[in-house]
């Protein structure tokens, strides 16, 4: 009887320890995700520059880690430059995924694409949307501002024809209801209260 009592206590002790370790691992994982999202917000805020010239022209750029001229850019360059601050090269990641899964990506008629192009593929909003859905997490679209968290990605369709993209930051609007967005819609890389200024068509999270 004494033997079984000792064995029972050992089993209970081991079970409690396992639960404790699992809880610690879970907390550590959540903290890592939160830390990344905050870092992405900080990275986006760090590249704010209203003097950036909005230029959608095609540029031949290095690969990997290529970028258009520093004084130029469009909305997608905000995303690319922010992630690159964290050591993540979306040019390379998107190119590699497109090479392996070209048919999964949109091939809009105006692009006339028959193969991948690392100069421009990652700078197109529809390609970013597909990549974030494939490799990250597609989130619900909502009219509730609290649904859009720090470090998440939002895409819009402006006037029914212009795809747009931005990063949700940890900064709040004056009324405290909405997170501010870093984006570039023609006024440079800026931080604005614009979450619901355009039609939201995509909501994503991509953490590493």
Predicted segments — roles?
Residues 2-7:
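Sec-dependent signal peptide recognition
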Residues 12-15:
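C-terminal motif of bacterial Sec signal peptides marking the signal peptidase cleavage site
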Residues 17-19:
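Bacterial signal peptide processing site
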Residues 26-34, 61-70, 114-118, 139-142, ...:
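Second-shell loop/turn segments in exported
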Residues 36-41, 99-181:
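...with weaker cross-activation on analogous glycine-rich loops/strands in unrelated enzymes
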Residues 45, 49, 80-88, 95, ...:
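Sec-exported extracytoplasmic/periplasmic mature domains
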Residues 55-76, 89-113:
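Acidic helix-start/capping segments at beta-turn-to-alpha-helix junctions
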Residues 176-208:
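Low-complexity, Gly/Ser/Thr/Pro-rich intrinsically disordered linker/tail segments
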């Amino acid at each position: 009887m004494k033997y079984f009592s000792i064995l029972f206590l050992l089993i209970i002790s081991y079970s409690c320890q396992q639960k404790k370790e699992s809880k610690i691992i879970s907390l550590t994982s959540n903290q890592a995700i939160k830390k990344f999202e905050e870092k992405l917000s900080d990275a986006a805020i760090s590249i704010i520059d209203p003097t950036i010239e909005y230029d959608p022209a095609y540029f031949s750029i290095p690969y990997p880690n290529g970028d258009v001229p520093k004084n130029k850019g469009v909305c997608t360059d905000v995303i690319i430059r922010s992630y690159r601050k964290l050591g993540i090269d979306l040019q390379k990641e998107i190119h590699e995924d497109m090479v392996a899964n070209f048919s999964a990506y949109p091939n809009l008629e105006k692009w006339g694409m028959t193969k991948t192009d690392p100069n421009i593929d990652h700078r197109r909003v529809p390609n970013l949307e597909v990549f974030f859905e494939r490799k990250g997490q597609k989130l619900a679209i909502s009219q509730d501002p609290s649904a859009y968290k720090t470090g998440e990605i939002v895409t819009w369709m402006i006037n029914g024809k212009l795809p747009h993209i931005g990063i949700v930051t940890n900064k709040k609007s004056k009324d405290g209801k909405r997170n501010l967005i870093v984006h570039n819609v023609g006024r440079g890389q800026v931080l604005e209260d614009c979450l619901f200024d355009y039609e939201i068509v995509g909501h994503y999270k991509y953490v590493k």
